Amino acid sequence: MPNNIVVYDLLISCPSDVSEYVDILEKEVNHFNNFWGRTNNVIIRTRHWSKDSYSEFGSYPQKLLNKQIVDSSDMAIGVFWTRFGSPTENYGSGTEEEIERMISMNKQVFLYFLDKPISPSKIDHTQYEKIKQFMEEHKNKGIYFTIQDERTLAKKFRENLELYFDSIIRGTEFKKSSVKKE
C-alpha cells in the first residue's frame, strides 16, 4: 500500500579539509532513512555542491550554488575543522554564506566543529582563527557541538536528526519565528 512520505533536502556544507566526512554524513542519513525515517514516513535527501550542482555562468559561483541547491534546501549541516574556506563576494567562505543564508531563512542548521589532532605544520593559522571567530560570533545565537572524531560526529549527528524530527512529529519543534529580539 502506498505511503505519504515527506521528503526533506539536507544541505551538507563544509570546507575542503572535511570533504571526507561527506560520505560519513551521507551514511548516517541513509541509516536514519532506513530505520527512523521509514517508521515515520520521512526521507532525507542529501545535497552537496560536488554532486548536485551543474556548470553555469552569469554570476559569481556561490550565488549560482545558492540558486541551484542552497536556497531550496530545507535544512543544513555545517562542519568545520581547520579551514574556514574560500571567501565569497559577501562572506568569509562559501560554508559561512550557506549557513548564514539558512539561518536567515529560519531553516534548521546542525553545526559541528571538529577538535581532532593535526600536525601544527598542516594548519593555516589564519583559516583557523576565522573558525574561532565564527564560533565566538555564534555561541549565543544557537547550539553547536565540538566533537573529537569521525565516530563521534556520526553518532551526534544521528542523535540530532532523530531528536529534531521527533520534535516535528510530536509538534514541539522550536518555533524560531516566536523568538523575541532584544
Where are these regions (language model features)?
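Conserved catalytic or regulatory cores that recognize and/or transform ribose-phosphate-containing ligands
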Residues: 1-182
